[in-house]
Amino acid sequence: MKRTYQPSVVRRKRTHGFRVRMATRGGRAVLNARRAKGRKRLAA
């Protein structure tokens, strides 16, 4: 059986990247929450 996670840098960036997060209000909320928590990496 094929595994569900087949990594692709392009797909990863397009769905979870910084630019995508910044595009929507909810995404910006995610970034702000991660900043408040002190995350080293904000987005993929």
From Swiss-Prot:
Keywords: Ribonucleoprotein, Ribosomal protein. Disulfide bonds: none annotated. InterPro entries: Ribosomal_bL34 (IPR000271), Ribosomal_bL34_CS (IPR020939). NCBIfam families: rpmH_bact. GO terms for molecular function: structural constituent of ribosome. One of its GO terms (cellular component) is ribonucleoprotein complex. The lineage of its organism: Bacteria, Pseudomonadati, Pseudomonadota, Betaproteobacteria, Burkholderiales. Belongs to the bacterial ribosomal protein bL34 family. GO terms for biological process: translation. This is Large ribosomal subunit protein bL34. It comes from the Bacteria. It comes from Herminiimonas arsenicoxydans.
